[in-house]
Amino acid sequence: KPPFGALLAMLINGVSLFLCPVPMPVLGVVAIAAAIAWVVLFGREGVADTNCALVISPLGLVGFAPLAPMIAGYCLPPRRALGAAIIQVVLMLTVGKNTGPELLFGSITSIPTWIMICGWIIATVLMSVLCVRETRILSILGAICAALILLIAQGIGLTILTGFPAGPSGTWAITTVLACVAMCVVGVLGSSVRHKGE
């Protein structure tokens, strides 16, 4: 089943990190714990949870990582969207060098990284909350709010990193806006690919 296949993949990822001194074994332990907790709490809910959690890897590979939290927020109820967002973050921190999103986070010990993580999770949950009623207007509003949070989070992170006021990078801004537009179109079309029942 997809959830157990996802668990196996994430466990292998965690073990490989634990056995590798770089970046750090503790990250492997975190990855293993997060994978087990996610499957126990959320992953068994259905295929949608698995897809929303793991979609970050292919999207990051093609440069559209900002679409991942919006997809999770659109398709899942808040509690399950939170679980998917956490797994997305863990995957970005652990396999980012293979999928691209490491440029969004950088070092796990830096403040900008944690600002981005918080923004990512808040954007996902807020979009999910707004999309619960499954109306076109709230779906569009959810996508816009999620995009703004992602843009602001990176802007704040870059400001702290550089020491002077800065906005999000051009690439991040473009991909986030495109992701927002895509989700607005999905919202207008009223796609039924949702699993909002808790």
Located regions from the model:
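Structural signature of hydrophobic alpha-helical transmembrane segments
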Residues: 20-32, 109-118
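Transmembrane helix-loop junctions in multi-pass membrane proteins
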Residues: 3, 95-102
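C-terminal transmembrane helix-loop-helix hairpin of multi-pass membrane proteins
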Residues: 100-198
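Membrane-interfacial loop-to-helix junctions in multi-pass transporters
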Residues: 2, 78-79, 114
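Short helix-perturbing small/polar motifs within transmembrane alpha-helices
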Residues: 28-98, 119-135, 146-152
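Core alpha-helical transmembrane segments of integral membrane proteins
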Residues: 1-23, 32-37
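Membrane-interfacial loop-to-transmembrane alpha-helix junctions, especially the N-terminal start
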Residues: 3-8, 48, 138-143
